[in-house]
Amino acid sequence: MENREQEEIEPCVSITIDPNNNKLNVDDFDRICTIGTGSFGRVYLVQHRASEQYFALKKMAIREVVSMRQTEHVHSEKRLLSRLSHPFIVKMYCASWDKYNLYMLFEYLAGGELFSYLRASRTFSNSMARFYAAEIVCALQYLHSKNIAYRDLKPENLMLNKEGHLKMTDFGFAKEVIDRTWTMCGTPEYLAPEVIGNKGHDTAVDWWSLGVLIYEMMIGIPPFRGKTLDEIYEKIILGKLRFTRSFDLFAKDLVKKLLQVDRTQRLGNQKDGAADVMNHKWFTDIDWDDVQNMKLTPPIIPTLYSNGDTGNFDSYDECSDDEIAAPQHELELFEDW
């Protein structure tokens, strides 16, 4: 990348979606390359021919979605994202399907995964961790106001836009929870005790995961680790924490209050909700209006040489386009897609 001359990046042009016909026509886009892979699909960088704007196109094979019993999860992701609008949540523009795949069109987050930056630097400074935690708190406050539990907060699901601000992505596990839900889902090291114990859970699980994330950002590893899932789960249920001497005292206090095994005692899950987290001493210097309005200067400004730069993503082998059509009974599961 050092051999390329840096260009001035033009502001993105908004693609206009007809609110009465927000279906995606895949033929309107040129596929550039793969920027992510999953169990039943890929994410491509694509360019809209008419506007020359770049987007991320998520393509999921219908046969794989059904065989892996992810039908409800993908429906839920599309349904939730279509009604969410927040500066720290990825924007979904539209969706479509054919006899092979489901498609979802997202804004292109050229900065890549927060996970990549954390692994490269091993740890984040106290101020860096606080910046990202503050943006996450704003997003969680918004989601929880709509009774939505995100349920999969981790560095791999947090991406940076070209300015360096954070965006929550991958809403496959997100769910509207009026009372409690019992489905066990998420990443083992980030699961809350009530999920593991199958006691029913709600939005409180996100505050637990935030505690795990802050700890990992500042130490480089999650607080509960083990060689087996049972070992990890046992440590989570016990909830014993170890901190390095250099761990900021206010950050330590916040993490301990977020990682309360008893969900009724967990910060963020009490009467004043997210406001309790926002008012914690670790965030004393944070102006929450500035956070919400993206006025704070991000600690990491992604290196980009053009709007379609993919230098902040891993390289992937491109797969062939030989696809198998889904049978009619599977296609019927997505008639309202």
UniProtKB/Swiss-Prot annotation:
EC number: 2.7.11.11
Substrates-to-products reaction catalysed: L-seryl-[protein] + ATP = O-phospho-L-seryl-[protein] + ADP + H(+); L-threonyl-[protein] + ATP = O-phospho-L-threonyl-[protein] + ADP + H(+)
Domain (Protein kinase): residue spans on this chain: 29-283
Record InterPro entries: AGC-kinase_C, Kinase-like_dom_sf, Prot_kinase_dom, Protein_kinase_ATP_BS, Ser/Thr_kinase_AS
Pfam annotation, one family: Pkinase
Keywords: ATP-binding, cAMP, Kinase, Nucleotide-binding, Phosphoprotein, Serine/threonine-protein kinase, Transferase
Location of the active site: 152 (proton acceptor)
Entry GO CC: cAMP-dependent protein kinase complex; cytosol
Gene3D superfamilies: Phosphorylase Kinase, domain 1 (3.30.200.20), Transferase(Phosphotransferase) domain 1 (1.10.510.10)
Molecular function GO labels: ATP binding; cAMP-dependent protein kinase activity; protein serine kinase activity
Top-level taxon of the source organism: Eukaryota
Binding site for ATP: 35-43, 58
Matching SUPFAM superfamilies: Protein kinase-like (PK-like) (SSF56112)
Residue ranges annotated for the AGC-kinase C-terminal domain, each copy included: 284-337
Function: Phosphorylates phosphofructokinase to activate it.
Subunit structure, interactors included: Composed of two regulatory chains and two catalytic chains.
Entry similarity comment: Belongs to the protein kinase superfamily. AGC Ser/Thr protein kinase family. cAMP subfamily.
Protein name: cAMP-dependent protein kinase catalytic subunit
Organism placement in taxonomy: Eukaryota, Metazoa, Ecdysozoa, Nematoda, Chromadorea
